[in-house]
Amino acid sequence: MKDVVIVGALRTPIGCFRGALAGHSAVELGSLVVKALIERTSVPAYAVDEVILGQVLTAGAGQNPARQSAIKGGLPNSVSAITINDVCGSGLKALHLATQAIQCGEADIVIAGGQENMSRAPHVLTDSRTGAQLGNSQLVDSLVHDGLWDAFNDYHIGVPAENLAREYGISRQLQDAYALSSQQKARAAIDAGRFKDEIVPVMTQSNGQTLVIDTDEQPRTDASAEGLARLNPSFDSLGSVTAGNASSINDGAAAVMMMSEAKARALNLPVLARIRAFASVGVDPALMGIAPVYATRRCLERVGWQLADVDLIEANEAFAAQALSVGKMLEWDERRVNVNGGAIALGHPIGASGCRILVSLVHEMVKRNARKGLATLCIGGGQGVALTIERDE
């Protein structure tokens, strides 16, 4: 099979819920990244074979949002596109599918990633087609129902985080300390300009003025142990998971340009990283946050690595309790994990996050001259994904 490489990796800044990017649809955000990948790699738009983008919240977004992003991003009508929904893992699963297409010879060049605008997710009147006859009708929040609700146990996906906290003995104090560390690392990374190379600025209008959004909006400058300790539990009055030690609701997009190594050589493009292996797993939905343990183990087994061989890890921080449980099970070196902060600080635009962590991983590996990297996420509904990449020595 063909070797698959990444030659471009970009993302938008991550916007707060109803924040600076709220006025831009997921398609607008995704198209900006698609366009920037073409411009920065100088790959002819017509040479792209397919676009694969994750998006979870598609109610009211129009037909096939990935196709919209491809065309709006400057690709010709001849380039096909598909939108996928693997919940939080969508953006990384897109890379799995792109890798398979290239390995099998069905494509040479694929743009893969994810996009989401959680701020614009509509409320849905589910009985409007048939009529309510008598009585009231209920509006369903598609953001929660389609993105954050466990369909099997009929509860918020924060409840499995509480389950993990109890199962693995993760205290409130440990969760808050983890969250504070994520905030501090993200703020230090922003101040040091660690994300500049990976971010595509977004132009937006505010009070008649054009603003350039080029920095992640979510990380807090006022995060403190005292402030985190004052927050009430969000899902269980006697629980430990709060808004402060969980990821947030956000807007953003991320994508990578992938191709066969032979095509990269033919186009004289520098290789940022090689795809080495990927894995998807399923677990009990009530313990969905532990799935990265099994996805990581399967992925490492496929490539023949030990966890100690991996130089940098990006593991999505859905919840501090979840991240700590995974770390406890895998016994990884915390100094190699989310070195610039994670989703608790940076945010979690669900359809985009899988690719966002991969983009950040690639760029940090380049900066540190690291060789081996791992990206992994848990997925609402009881799944996990992982992907390993390697850079040439």
State each model region's role.
Residues M1-A61, P65-G73, S80, P160-R172, ...:
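Conserved active-site "lid/cap" helical segment
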Residues L10-T12, A22-L32, R40, L174-A266, ...:
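N-terminal extracellular/periplasmic Venus flytrap/periplasmic-binding protein-like
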Residues Y46-G54, A81-N85, V110-Q115, L174-S181, ...:
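Beta-strand segments within the central parallel beta-sheet cores of soluble alpha/beta enzyme folds
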Residues I84-E116, V159, A165-R194, A255-A262, ...:
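Active-site-proximal alpha-helical scaffold in enzymes
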Residues I109-N163, E167:
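Flexible glycine-/small-residue-enriched beta->alpha junction loops
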